[in-house]
Curated annotation (Swiss-Prot):
The protein's required cofactors: FAD
Function: The electron transfer flavoprotein serves as a specific electron acceptor for several dehydrogenases, including five acyl-CoA dehydrogenases, glutaryl-CoA and sarcosine dehydrogenase. It transfers the electrons to the main mitochondrial respiratory chain via ETF-ubiquinone oxidoreductase (ETF dehydrogenase).
Highest taxon of source: Eukaryota
A GO CC term attached to the entry: mitochondrion
Principal subcellular localisation of the protein: mitochondrion
Signal peptide limits: none
Record lineage: Eukaryota, Fungi, Dikarya, Ascomycota, Taphrinomycotina
Any GO molecular function: flavin adenine dinucleotide binding
Stated name of the protein: Probable electron transfer flavoprotein subunit alpha, mitochondrial
Record-linked InterPro entries: DHS-like_NAD/FAD-binding_dom (IPR029035), ETF_a/b_N (IPR014730), ETF_a/FixB (IPR001308), ETF_alpha_N (IPR033947), ETF_asu_C (IPR014731), ETF_asu_C_CS (IPR018206), Rossmann-like_a/b/a_fold (IPR014729)
GO biological process terms on file: fatty acid beta-oxidation using acyl-CoA dehydrogenase
Family in the record: Belongs to the ETF alpha-subunit/FixB family.
Keywords for this protein: Electron transport, FAD, Flavoprotein, Mitochondrion, Transit peptide, Transport
The protein's assembly and partners: Heterodimer of an alpha and a beta subunit.
Length: 341
């Protein structure tokens, strides 16, 4: 097995000049940014809610953009553990321009005396939360995988080989959550949150929205798929990559992923990249086809329940992490495996 080390230290982050009137109260609230598309919540946002619950505070949801009033009502009834849902209805926020969202969040955090703001460590979260932290003059705590207490969190470093415990004395905690490290918050329809309209300062956008090209795909989303088939450099080119992996993925109902080398070589789209600089995933089954197992790639798959590797090099590092390994020619093994499924 891959040997890892765990190192813990406490870091007191610089206190902010921003003050909130909380005195010595023990009660506190955690505002969670809830991303949505097509009227549905992002699964990653439900994981952020679960992480927020573990602080011990009251968890509020924050919905912004087009149809946010309607979505908030739906969220309030469906997500079990929210106490309040705050919404800001404004179609101009539909495209999640970070400066706008951060400004709206800033005003609502101040109004509601929020002590923690959580979001998924997603494209939206990575754009909005650093800006929000700068506005409050506090340190952001990024990509957490554990909650120790209301002011202490665990996050990975060194490509996931070291887990660092970080403690902050900042009056407001700005936190992004690694979705694969937390289960989704229950959404069984037993929610009883109140819904309130938030403040809309209508900030001017510093960027202009031009266009969006959404690639429609019948496959499960790579970030949340239960099964993933991924390929690496030995697949040679884009045509071979698709010819070998697609039939297997179809049989398994799996998402398709790729290593950074495969993406850089043009075998697969950048959206399929898995690893430290790509997507962090935690499927029930991960099949690595022709992947050696660079440490940066392993950082993206280490939370998978079962890792199966196919590689002709018996000394490939991937076999130190894999639960199941097949040493052999992938061009023979994968078609045979696909045929037998």
């Amino acid at each position: 097995m891959l040997r890892t080390t765990s190192r813990t230290f406490s870091r007191a982050l610089s206190s902010s000049n921003f003050k909130i009137n909380c005195g010595r109260r023990h009660w506190f609230s955690v505002l969670t940014l809830l991303e949505h598309q097509g009227g549905n919540l992002s699964p990653a946002s439900l994981s952020a809610v679960e992480a927020a619950k573990r602080t011990g505070g009251d968890v509020f949801g924050f919905v912004i953009g087009k149809d946010s009033s309607q979505i908030s009502q739906k969220v309030a009834k469906s997500v079990n553990d929210l106490k309040k849902v705050i919404y800001v209805e404004n179609p101009s926020y539909e495209h999640n321009i970070p400066d706008q969202i951060a400004n709206v969040l800033f005003e609502n955090v101040k109004k509601n005396e929020i002590s923690h703001v959580f979001s998924a460590h997603s494209t939206v979260g990575k754009g909005v939360m650093p800006r929000l932290a700068a506005m409050f003059d506090v340190m952001q705590i990024s990509d957490i995988i554990g909650v120790v207490s209301a002011d202490t969190f665990v996050r990975p470093t060194y490509a996931g080989n070291v887990n660092v415990t970080v403690s902050t004395k900042d009056p407001i905690k700005i936190v992004t959550v690694r979705a694969s490290a937390f289960d989704a918050a229950p959404s069984s329809g037993e929610g009883a949150a109140t819904v309130v309209e938030g403040i809309d300062p209508k900030p001017a956008a510093l960027q202009e929205w031009v266009s969006e090209n959404i690639i429609k795909n019948a496959r499960p989303d790579l970030s949340s798929a239960e099964r993933v088939v991924a390929g690496g450099r030995p697949l040679k080119d884009k045509e071979t990559f698709e010819r070998i992996l697609t039939p297997l993925a179809d049989k398994l109902g799996a998402a398709i992923g790729a290593t950074r080398v495969a993406v850089d070589s043009g075998y697969a789209d950048n959206s399929l990249q898995i690893g430290q600089t790509g997507k962090i995933i935690a499927p029930k089954l991960y099949i690595a086809v022709g992947i050696d197992g660079a440490i940066q790639h392993l950082a993206g798959i280490k939370d998978s329940k079962v890792i199966a590797a196919i590689n002709r090099d018996e000394n490939a590092p991937i076999f130190q992490t894999a639960d199941v390994g097949i040493v052999g020619d992938l061009f023979e093994i994968v078609p045979e495996l696909t045929e037998k499924l």
